[in-house]
Amino acid sequence: MTEKRKQRMKTRNVILLLLLIAAAYACFLPLPRSIHVTHSAVAWRNCDDANTPTSVTMDGIYFDYLFREDYFDGAITVSGFPETFKPLPRVTFHDGMGMLFYQGEQGLLEPMFGWIIPSPEGSAFTIGVHNEHGWSADTGLNITGPADNRYEAVQLANKLCQRYHPSFLGTWTFE
């Protein structure tokens, strides 16, 4: 083997190693997305036809990972729900669902407000609001947007649950 060929192979191996390191590094870096939106939304229950118009503001950064759980740093506020105007610690998403815990007095976490399933770009969401007994697919309060009426909210909630939280398939179907 000539000296020139050895040098080319050495250069090629170094370049391949650098590319491999860069690819591995890129796989573990997040893809951050700024989200600054206010959506019209509908608060509704699966057990009746009642619905209440509201709005939800998302303001923060969504960190989308390839091999880790995604998370959101920022604020999610719902008009008509004063408990959501408090600080919101980082929301980590497991299988597409995140839990909303707001901070109360002296920085202590209050009981869980609910869960959220957003689209990663923040263009749509559904929130299940917990009460003192938790949340039920049959009678629990949901807030879904963007939606202008109950029908749109139910359709969007079903779509989000099935797409971003696959374990819901066949378990929860909103009507």
Predicted regions and their residues:
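N-terminal Lys/Arg-rich, disordered targeting/topogenic segments
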Residues: M1-M9
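Hydrophobic membrane-insertion alpha-helices, especially the h-region
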Residues: T11-P30
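A short linear-motif detector with a strong N-terminal bias
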Residues: I15-L20, I35-V37, P53-S55
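Tryptophan-anchored aromatic micro-motifs
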Residues: R33-T52
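Exposed beta-strand and adjacent loop surfaces of beta-rich binding modules
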Residues: H36-T38, Y71-D73, A124
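Extracytoplasmic/periplasmic/luminal assembly and interaction segments
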Residues: D49, P53-G104
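Non-cytosolic head/periplasmic domains of membrane-anchored proteins
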Residues: L88-E175
